[in-house]
Amino acid sequence: MQSRVTAAVAALMMVMPAMTAAQQAADQGRFIDAPGHVLAHRDRIEPVNRMLSERFEQLLPGLMQETGIDMWLVLNREYAEDPVFFTLVPEPVFAARRTTMLIFHDRGEEGVDRLTVNRYPYGDPYESAWEGGNLDDQWLALGALIAERDPQRIGINVSRDWPVADGLTAALRDRLMEVLTPELQARVTSAEELVVRWLETRASSELATYPQIVSLARGVISEAFSSRVITPGATTTADVQWYIRQRFHELQLDPWFHPSVNVQRAGLECGKESPFCGTSGVIEPGDVLHTDVGVCYLRLCTDTQEMGYVARLGEETVPDSLGAALATGNRWQDHLTGSYVAGRTGNEILAATISACEAEDMICSTYTHPLGFFGHAPGPTIGMWDNQGPTPIRGDWPLYESTAFSIEGNVKVQIPEWDGQWIQIKLEQDAVFEGGTVSYIAGRQTEWHIVR
């Protein structure tokens, strides 16, 4: 078994040096022509559980102290789990069993105790505080445990503004309050800040692993936007969508939404004020392609959009104006990532990005979001496609270190070869904010995919 684990981890890490070198390039451009190695499900258990242990040891104590929660309760029932539950349990866990209670107690310098009050104990990395018995006994045991430990602020997952922090059902909350004394009831508070910080913060081992995960998604896009998949005049956008979906299935990767593919072409109107441009149908020579894909692997998710071009007969590369259009999209990315400053809110980053684009008469739209355990993760929202002004609550969240984002948005550019028609360059590349700098996790698209 040890040899299997060692081989699996080695296979997972073998692509890292090249990725690091690519990230050091000035523009961080990188072309990935095929997906890399994917671990078998059995071999994914060790790295996932190792990353979970690191998160518990390196992140959770500081986050609980930062948010002022000294006891965090994550209470679940089978098939009605709190969304946070799956980020807290070791592999291979598929669901809560009966009623599953996770308790985290910050004891200061002694660290955070990770406890369960369950019919079935989890074992490492949890200590069983109670097991067996019936449901009434289980709830009484939870109440007794809380009373014995006497926490000052008891965090529960209820939130009006953050969906992923609102996983405690009404029935479980009522049952909890029944087993607490009035004094302890008064100490119960929302754990929403702790939940957001737990979900948005990446451990060092996750940052080391993430490039491989993002490169898988980018590699499948390269396959899809090539003559291996597309025959101009015959292949449809739906064919490419389903190729991508099937390819993820073959690689045993979990998509978190169905891939989309669309085309823009000369003569198909793209209004200057249109929020999105593109249509579906048969792919023809001269078409501009766009796709949006997202997968999750080793519990970390990707969200990627890239552009392609279908060469006409005799063309070896894209028209110069399309090359310039993609460069404009990269310039918008630079304005956005250059506006990332720790402590700035999402709304402040958006305003700085818009100001920089307007100074260059660039028509841009920014709708960037955090990334991690979820494709649309909590953290600072930086614009919405239908709102380029401040976003209440989520846009007011500040930027922290060791957080990942999908750098998502678009620019509009006129194409002389298309009689001045507008074209939309829609990009989404995954990045991490670390050490005061934004680095693309597996590079970014700086050259077109070309179907020859």
Name every feature range the model reports, one short phrase each:
Residues A8-P17:
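Bacterial N-terminal signal peptides
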Residues Q23-R452:
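Active-site neighborhoods and metal-handling regions in enzymes and metal-associated proteins
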Residues M1-V9:
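Bacterial N-terminal signal peptides that target proteins for export
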Residues A18-A22:
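Sec/Tat signal peptide C-region and signal peptidase I cleavage site
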